[in-house]
Amino acid sequence: MRVEQVNWVDIPAGLLRRGTPVDEIAAVARRYADIRVPVEWYLKEAPRAEIHVPAFRIARTPVTVGQWARFAAATGRPVPETPADHPVIGVPWEAATAYCRWLGERLGLDVRLPTEDEWERAARGDDGREFPWGEEYRTGLANLLDLGIGTTMPVGSFPDGASPFGVLDMAGNADEWTSTPYAPYPGAPAEVPTTEDWAFDRHITRGGAFRHDRDLARCARRHGAYEEDLEAIGVGFRLAAPAA
């Protein structure tokens, strides 16, 4: 495959069961109590809502080092010293959107980052599942902290962890930028913060990376780039485009 080509997955228009019901947040916090995440962090997922998401396309895997390298050469940006088939990480949001514009010009297509709702629909499908592969967490379906790898792996290494639409690596390996700035969901509990001033960047990331615990791999989990060293925390991105 040429670096300009993208393996697109068509996501049909449909209802997203977005987020987590308010009355289930305490149970979620108990389920992941060993990770010691404050319950307030999970409250950002509330309330549950049914959202219509128009049809779109999303890349089957995150952007790889090999795909990034040609853009980097053309724009004077660094290329990570990791294998070409690994996800590129350490990419600021502005650089990710610049890649989208560059590739879009080459393909004659409106390439962009997915919105937060698009990302969650591609991960959850129609049934509002907890993880891309189903309701229960299973070690070995994603490159997360419990696997003990400690770095990225080739994209698509966990086909059994695919989402209902066949999208890969929606959990683990690389955390992924969306185009959506953080804001509480409409109707959110009063204690949900209105901003995330502590975050290095206000845009939502999704999916978790190789260094993260399993709770960040939950389809509903909303978080951000909490450290300036985006390579250390494994932040990458995947592409979206209008429906064919």
Model regions and ranges:
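Short, compositionally biased
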Residues: 1-75, 93-94, 101, 105, ...
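Functional-site microenvironments in short loops/helix caps that host divalent-cation chemistry
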Residues: 11, 17, 22-26, 30-40, ...
